[in-house]
Amino acid sequence: LDVVLGFESVLNPPAHLQRQYLFSDSMACVVRQGHPLISKPPSLEEFVAVPHMLISRTGSNIGIIDQKLTELGLERRIKLIVPHFLSAPLIVAKTDMILSLPYRIAEQFMKFAPLSIFPVPIDLPEYDLCMIWHPLRDKDPAHQWLRDKITAICRNI
C-alpha cells in the first residue's frame, strides 16, 4: 500500500503517519437525467424516501449523511452499497437511486454519464481530503513522484 486517499475526519489516521491536505469539498447528490427529483430541489422527506446508493470501502451502511440524518430522527433507504467510485455513476445513470458524494467527484462523473447534480438537502460541514502514507516512504523518489502526481491531479479537479 503506497498511499491512502480519504476524508481525514473519517480516516482518523494515527499521528505517526505522514499526511498531505489535498482539498476541501462539500457533498452533492447525483441522479440520472430525467429523474423526478430534479424538477425542483427535493425536501428532506423526499430525499430520504428515494432509494440511495452508498459508496463504502468497508461495506458499512452508515455514511456521513446517515449520521446527520440519525441526529434529525430520519433514515434514508440504502438500496445498494458499492466499495468504490468506479461503477457508481454508471449504475445511478440507469436507475432511480440517488448517490451522495463529493461535489468535485460528482462534476467529473457528469462528464461521462448522463447525470444531474443537486445539493444535499441537509446542512453538512465541508471536509478535507488528504493523502496519508508511512514515514518510511517519505524520501523514496518513486513514492515522492507518485505523491506529486496525485497532488497535481487533485489541483485540477
Where in the sequence are the language-model features?
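Hydrophobic hinge/microswitch elements
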Residues: 1, 7, 58-116
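Short beta-strand-centered segments that line the small-molecule binding cleft or hinge
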Residues: 1-27, 31, 116-118
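Structural motif corresponding to alpha-helix initiation and N-cap regions
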Residues: 15-16, 40-41, 85
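Alpha-helical segments flanking ligand/cofactor-binding loops in enzyme cores
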Residues: 20, 45, 89-90
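A late-sequence structural motif
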Residues: 33, 39, 105, 115-157
